[in-house]
Regions:
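Alpha/beta-hydrolase superfamily serine-hydrolase fold, recognizing
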Residues: 2-335
Length: 335
């Protein structure tokens, strides 16, 4: 399959050719982009720039980590959904995917888009997980302020955020990841990983030789993110495996929904298949959809608008909200 749209300059290489996706134990979704998801059906209230943690950076500075919270303007306590933005582990902009977050909030959830440390902060995957867990704990401890049902929470991430969501969801009971946040409030009842990375050394496995060789021969920022700045992937296999969510798949893991576009030019769709198969082998409830023709989420807006529309179609977004209702409504307070 060859893709030749004009693409913007990006901090990661863009594939020219993509192998057909592995559909084992997965479902191929042939999505009509219309109708698009609904918006404006429920009045929302927002709480912006909510500080949930202050962290020390390697340069001696400190940084406040913040969340933007959306919820229906009712007095009802609702399950919490933490949204983790993507950004190639180079940036984390909590303002991303606003319409998607609005739709999910209108569907009956408290949706908090949260910041987490990334490579330019000197952050590693351990720091990202700690930050997300801090957001979970703080928001649930202040459930009264936001109308949160603290018994029910999910993680939902896109791209790099999908990686962090999966890793956080699978390590809630491990002391090395939880530290002083080892509490049930730091665990979740469901995880959504949308076109996320996993085993970073295999990020280009589905792509053309030029992109594969780039990752083999270049010490990228991904090496810094796994704690080995300046190293090639071939030099740090243990560190790469330690940062891979699939490493921590167990039978006690929460249910997972994984989604990936068949035409993803930035992250091989085999990355979510890798996590999906590890979860299934461990005996975990895992569902994976491959969206036919879809690109890398909002990246499609820049290069292929039709491919981007799949991610905001009623079909795909309804799969997300139905998954959340199925696993969070039963975990929370009677409604």
């Amino acid at each position: 399959m060859t893709h030749t749209p004009s693409v913007p300059r990006l901090p990661v290489p863009v594939a020219a050719t993509i192998a057909p996706p592995d559909l084992a134990d997965s479902t191929l979704l042939e999505v009509n982009p219309h109708p698009q998801m609904s918006l404006g059906t429920v009045e929302l209230e927002s709480h912006l720039d909510v500080t949930f943690s202050t962290v020390d950076l390697p340069n001696g500075a400190s940084r406040e980590l913040k969340a933007d919270v959306l919820r229906p303007a009712t007095g009802e306590r609702l399950p919490l959904v933490l949204f983790l933005p993507g950004g190639a582990f180079l940036r984390c902009n909590k303002a991303m995917a606003l319409d998607l977050r609005r739709h999910v909030a209108e569907s009956g959830f408290v949706v908090a888009s949260v910041e987490y440390r990334v490579a330019p902060d000197g952050g590693t995957y351990m720091d990202s997980v700690h930050d997300v867990r801090a957001a979970l704990v703080q928001l649930r401890q202040h459930a009264d302020d936001f109308g949160i049902d603290p018994r029910a929470a999910a993680l939902w991430g896109e791209s790099a955020g999908g990686h962090v969501a999966a890793l956080t969801g699978l390590t809630g009971e491990l002391p090395e990841f939880s530290g002083d946040l080892a509490t049930p409030l730091g665990t979740v009842q469901a995880v959504i990983d949308a076109f996320g990375t996993s085993l970073l050394s295999a990020i280009a496995d589905d792509f053309d030789e030029e992109v594969r060789l780039h990752y083999e021969r270049t010490a990228t920022h991904f090496s810094a993110y796994v704690g080995k700045a300046g190293a090639l992937f071939s030099e740090i296999p243990e560190a790469v495996v330690a940062a891979d969510p699939a490493t921590y798949a167990t039978a006690s893991a929460p249910p997972f929904l994984l989604l990936h576009g068949s035409a993803d030019m930035l992250v091989s769709s085999s990355q979510t298949q890798h996590v999906h198969q590890a979860l299934r082998t461990a005996g975990t409830d895992s569902t994976r959809y491959v969206v036919d023709g879809a690109n890398h989420g909002d990246f499609g807006v820049l290069a292929d608008s039709d491919a981007a529309l799949a991610w905001t179609s009623a079909t795909v977004v309804n799969d997300i909200t139905e998954f959340l209702h199925r696993h969070l409504d039963s975990a929370g307070l009677p409604r």
